[in-house]
Amino acid sequence: MKRLLFFALLLSFCNTLFAQEIKTDSILTEKQNAEWISEFEKLDYKSEKIAEIKKKIFADTIYKRQKNYCRIVIKNQETIQEAMEIANCECKIVFVLGFKKIAYSLDPNEYPKTHTVLELVTDENIDKITVLKGDIASALYGTNGRCGVVVMYSESRKFKRKIKNVL
């Protein structure tokens, strides 16, 4: 009987070792995005930046862009600035593919053909990559841009035609 009990405990313990990790972080915060942007800005090569952008876009597909606003609770003896730093506001970085007169948002949750568009993006097609933060991002992209905006610019007409054909 002791052997059976010992075997059952050993079996249940082994099962917990191989169980998948439960993801408890269900929101993407401003702090996480600020850390990603600071790491992104340290990259030197355009090909590395494009690969990192693609990885981030696919990783963020599990998060949906929320339409509600951030709720900030101010406690006793706390300034508004301190409360805003503590608040966990949910937001996503906006990724944009920009041409001279038109720009496309790269969010797979809103636009299902984003995966196809991203397959066409290479370092030869992209002329420059710009990161917008703070007031500039909010002014251009509204509340969606408060966590930052990454814009990939291209002046290639051939690439623009390929994108139009996909969309």
Question: What are the roles of these predicted feature ranges?
Answer:
Residues Q20-L167:
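Short, small/polar-rich motifs associated with maturation and membrane association
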